[in-house]
Amino acid sequence: MERTTLRRRALVAGTATVAVGALALAGLTGVASADPAATAAPPVSADSLSPGMLAALERDLGLDEDAARSRIANEYRAAAVAAGLEKSLGARYAGARVSGAKATLTVATTDASEAARITEAGARAEVVGHSLDRFEGVKKSLDKAALDKAPKNVPVWYVDVAANRVVVNAASPAAGQAFLKVAGVDRGLVTVARSAEQPRALADIRGGDAYYMNGSGRCSVGFSVTRGTQNGFATAGHCGRVGTTTNGVNQQAQGTFQGSTFPGRDIAWVATNANWTPRPLVNGYGRGDVTVAGSTASVVGASVCRSGSTTGWHCGTIQQLNTSVTYPEGTISGVTRTSVCAEPGDSGGSYISGSQAQGVTSGGSGNCSSGGTTYFQPINPLLQAYGLTLVTSGGGTPTDPPTTPPTDSPGGTWAVGTAYAAGATVTYGGATYRCLQAHTAQPGWTPADVPALWQRV
């Protein structure tokens, strides 16, 4: 979003790590597993990858076209495998990430006896000292302290699944330690990293297109959505409050903000008038639009591309999930940290991995000349918060659970939290269904109730 208070230049510097407490691993070490068992490639068709996305991946990540296609396919498969292992490992799950040119999936656990299960699922196993749940509890305490009073000189904190730590970025060790003291967390689970980062909000319906608020500031469309018969788009909350009117990229009357939250979260949606038709597309800025097929969330290390009305199309990688970041206006929790660059006016724009919607641009530091760090608001929590349906090439992803959940389980192989690829089959209520579009199952999205996702066979 473009506005005077957000035009300060953010400083980008390296980080010097300061350990606040030693991490006790209770004698556990990483497991050097055998190569994971081969699994079938996910259904990511070559036609679904736009020339613009491939070109941006080549430019920003140093990949050739074949490597970019292979990486996206591997990352898609990794997201599905990681989701399944997170569910099956439960409290023993310690996070997942991809790394290397081939996007090799590593899944961490606190239980060495689970290494074989992880390897059999097609991932490399790593045994660590603490579960993801434990670190999420620490981060939750930090978030609560920040909501009571935003910490001074502490811009970012997150769970680093690769390091099996909570990391707090601060202008000085003293500032970081003061924040930990206020939050009352176990310092033995936290690393304070010195950082000069100063994040700020960046300020047909098609992701990445410009829109204008009340005839003044500019932001970018995230993704086309519907709510019942009402069309609209998802975007960032800091771009406008409820009742703020918008004009589209052509400067014609477009819509009105119906929901908006900022700070705390950075989510919003705009209802558009009858002159605007939602499309399952993201603007490729001269290199072909990208089709949106679903919203399966990617894992740490996966590639991700961003479309915005200031800087166009740029790519990078996902660095951390469930990050908290402090802007001048307050703290935002639950965003994803990335290496993609962005600038004011890109706010609200689309983040997408392959054909899967990931989120909308929130803010960051740096720029697209010198590089930087950005944060996006994940799309699935945004859709769920407002009861929206993502417009996709398969007809939409439902987000409204039934008002009265069933009291008895109908049985079958379908399960909440599982990532399903297009073409996968499940049983539910005595019937067999085929998945029509990739997604991660949510409560209420049962095969019998969501024909946009499942077809009975």
From Swiss-Prot:
Belongs to the peptidase S1 family. One of its GO terms (biological process) is carbohydrate metabolic process. Keywords: Disulfide bond, Hydrolase, Protease, Serine protease, Signal, Zymogen. It comes from Streptomyces griseus. InterPro entries: CBM5/12, CBM_sf_5/12, Pept_S1_alpha_lytic, Pept_S1A_streptogrisin, Peptidase_S1_PA, Peptidase_S1_PA_chymotrypsin, Streptogrisin_prodomain, TAT_signal. Gene3D superfamilies: 3.30.300.50, Carbohydrate-binding module superfamily 5/12 (2.10.10.20), Trypsin-like serine proteases (2.40.10.10). Residues 394-413 are annotated as: Linker. Coiled coil: none annotated. The active site is at H238 (charge relay system), D266 (charge relay system), S347 (charge relay system). Hydrolysis of proteins with specificity similar to chymotrypsin. May be specialized for the degradation of chitin-linked proteins. Has a primary specificity for large aliphatic or aromatic amino acids. GO terms for molecular function: carbohydrate binding; hydrolase activity, hydrolyzing O-glycosyl compounds; serine-type endopeptidase activity. Residues 399-408 have a biased composition (Pro residues). SMART domains: ChtBD3. This is Streptogrisin-C.
